[in-house]
């Protein structure tokens, strides 16, 4: 009798536990499906998505539809790279109110005169933006932008509202401008205004690629088989009407990537045939690239949305690091110090930096920075 009572209680416990488990699963299934199952689905589909034309066909404009949106230039510099040998056309995506960020970039990695005199290369830096989104601040900010451009002549602005949901319009602005006014640039780079670019390392790299005559080149931090976010509370939410497939084509993080000049032309042409309502600009770049059969290459020292550790052994080969606003000028001073190159000189210097990079980059827990393989590059 006593044993029978224990069996009943045990069975009741199992029933209660099973009920709680099912209820919990029902409650959390949405997030689980969005974050885990969707990643599994998307990675399974990525080869199909990358290989077939039906994705592009579903997003292509119909013949009866008008082309991409047309916006007027409010500020423009058609002459910026006219009749010049331009190694790199550098677009910086910025917001109208981010004057301090633009100022810091002009004094560091975006400084054309520094690159010309110290690195023997010709780059053209342009800040791309729309109109101020706050109606109360719009007139004052616009006057300030006009004054700023009068001082520096490096702003390109069209009359769409500058917001997260218009990032693809900013993408179209960059490629339209490049195609119209600087088609001869050897490379094109697009970057956020809170990124750090190690310009000496990047220029050395691009000059070597130029000598090789590379084409069909697209490099950055690659996202493979990323799924659309279906959580309506996320700012990255994408509806099935906007994009119906379980995975995006491979693409590079929009924080910073580089393409060759021939790719810039092809991407612009592809962008004119696709529906630009998908507002995530780096994904839209992936769709354009998929249409022309271009595959992105991953570079260990492009951080994507990640932030790199602060250490001279990291600076030696770094290309980009994300999330630098307040410390940008200090990092520029430290990372471009000629002494950095001396740390890894010789056998013991190489061993020392190898150990440092393994400790900083090869951790068991996920770290959004350079991959572990960068420690051995």
Swiss-Prot record:
Query: In its keyword annotation, does this UniProt entry include Glycoprotein?
Result: yes
Species of provenance: Sus scrofa
Which PANTHER family does the entry link to?
BETA-1,3-N-ACETYLGLUCOSAMINYLTRANSFERASE, LACTOSYLCERAMIDE 1,3-N-ACETYL-BETA-D-GLUCOSAMINYLTRANSFERASE
Intrachain S-S bonds: none
Q: Which domain of life is it from?
A: Eukaryota
Q: Which GO terms describe its cellular component?
A: Golgi membrane
Q: Which InterPro entries match?
A: Glyco_trans_31
Query: What's this protein's family per the entry?
Result: Belongs to the glycosyltransferase 31 family.
Report keywords, A-Z. Answer: Developmental protein, Glycoprotein, Glycosyltransferase, Golgi apparatus, Lipid metabolism, Membrane, Signal-anchor, Transferase, Transmembrane, Transmembrane helix
Which residues are sugar-modified? Answer: 56, 166
Q: What is this protein called?
A: Lactosylceramide 1,3-N-acetyl-beta-D-glucosaminyltransferase
* Lineage of producing organism: Eukaryota, Metazoa, Chordata, Craniata, Vertebrata
Q: What are the coiled-coil residue ranges?
A: none
Q: Which GO BP terms apply?
A: central nervous system development; lipid metabolic process; protein O-linked glycosylation
**Which residues span the membrane?**
12-32
């Amino acid at each position: 009798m006593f044993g029978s009572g224990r069996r009943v209680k045990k069975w009741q416990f199992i029933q209660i536990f099973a009920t709680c488990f099912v209820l919990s699963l029902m409650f959390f299934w949405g997030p689980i499906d969005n974050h885990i199952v969707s990643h599994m689905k998307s990675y399974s589909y990525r080869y199909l998505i990358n290989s077939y034309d039906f994705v592009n066909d579903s997003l292509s404009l119909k013949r009866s539809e008008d082309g991409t949106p047309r916006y007027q230039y409010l500020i423009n510099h058609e002459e910026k790279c006219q009749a010049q040998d331009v190694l790199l056309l550098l677009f910086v995506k910025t917001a109208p109110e981010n004057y301090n960020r633009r100022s810091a970039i002009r004094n560091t990695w975006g400084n054309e005169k520094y690159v010309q005199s110290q690195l023997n290369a010709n780059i053209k830096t342009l800040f791309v933006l729309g109109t101020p989104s706050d109606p109360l601040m719009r007139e004052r900010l616009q006057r300030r932008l006009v004054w700023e451009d009068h001082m520096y002549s490096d702003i390109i602005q069209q009359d769409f509202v500058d917001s997260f949901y218009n990032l693809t319009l900013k993408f179209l602005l960059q490629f339209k401008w490049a195609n119209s006014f600087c088609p001869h640039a050897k490379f094109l780079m697009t970057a956020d205004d809170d990124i750090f670019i190690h310009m000496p390392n990047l220029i050395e790299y691009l000059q070597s690629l130029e000598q090789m005559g590379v084409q069909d080149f697209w490099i950055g931090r690659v996202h493979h088989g990323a799924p659309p976010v279906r959580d309506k509370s996320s700012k990255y939410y994408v509806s099935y009407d906007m994009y119906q497939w379980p995975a995006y084509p491979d693409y590079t993080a929009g924080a910073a990537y580089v393409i060759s000049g021939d790719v810039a032309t092809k991407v612009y042409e592809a962008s004119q045939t696709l529906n630009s309502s998908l507002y995530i600009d780096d994904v839209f770049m992936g769709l354009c690239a998929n249409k022309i059969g271009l595959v992105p290459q991953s570079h260990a020292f492009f951080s994507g949305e990640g932030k790199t550790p602060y250490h001279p052994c990291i600076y030696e080969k770094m290309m980009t690091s994300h999330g630098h606003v307040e410390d940008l000028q200090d990092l520029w001073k430290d990372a471009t110090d000629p002494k950095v190159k001396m740390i890894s000189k010789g056998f013991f210097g190489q061993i020392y930096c190898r150990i440092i990079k393994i400790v900083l980059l090869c951790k068991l827990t996920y770290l959004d920075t350079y991959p572990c393989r960068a420690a051995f590059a």
